Amino acid sequence: MTGIGICSPGPLDPRAGVVLNPPNLPCWRNFPLAAEIERVYGVRALVDNDANAAGLAEAIWGAGVGYHNVFFAILGTGIGTGIVFDRKIYHGRTGSAAEGGHMTIDYRGPRCGCGKLGCIEALASGPNIARRAQAKLAAGDASRIRELAGSVEAVRTEHIGQAFHEGDSIAREVLAETAMLLTVWLGNIVDVLEPDVMVFGGGVAELMSSFFESMRAGLEQWSINQRAGEIPLVLARYGNEAGIAGAAALCR
């Protein structure tokens, strides 16, 4: 074994191998992850943001093959993003670039785990999609979602997805709202980066893939870029193995 690749939630410093202050892992603040792995295993360790690494794998071997500029997003428990230009991760000056999940799209919105208000993660990640569905059910709306979950408190995105495929109107409403939130967010991404392709991984991405075409059409309204509606929105090749592929890509 010549090296170990590690995908970690960010923000982090990939050059130093230090995890800085991930909102969902507060116990890892300023944690020297690469140094600890090297101390234990005696080989070089490379650490990067999980979305950066997965995006690199998709650009090299997956759904981003053939494109120069790849925007990658993991839509799941949180929302993580990565930017890959010509098979190279864009890290920014300190390594903390591409934290697109914490881009605010509603300054009066719910508070995110990062402390800001109205981040796209606070609105369209899996747990927050479920919370919006729970609010509708708590208001008394009848839905198959409640039957599948057993109670309002137990609602998860898998229940919403199943109800959607069974034709439930509340599930469709919740997911259509999510699609609109994501479209507004992606319009900003396009205006800043103008990617050649946008690749999505994670359980929420699979759930939302039925809306990709309408989201792409919506980009014509939410971006000033004249070719926004031409940019493909595609599912990642590696799915739940994106982290493994990303770790391998770091060591290539």
Model-found features: residue ranges?
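ATP-binding/phosphotransfer module of carbohydrate and carboxylate kinases, centering on a glycine-rich
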Residues: 1-3, 12-18, 34-43, 57-67, ...
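A charged helix-plus-loop insertion that forms the helical arch/lid used to bind
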Residues: 18-28
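Generic enzyme active-site microenvironment
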Residues: 48, 56
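Active-site glycine-centered loops adjacent to acidic/histidine catalytic or metal-binding residues
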Residues: 50, 76, 247
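Conserved beta-strand elements of the Class I
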Residues: 71-73
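Short beta-strand scaffold segments in enzyme catalytic cores
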Residues: 80-84
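Structural signature of FAD isoalloxazine-binding scaffolds in flavoprotein oxidoreductases
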Residues: 96-99
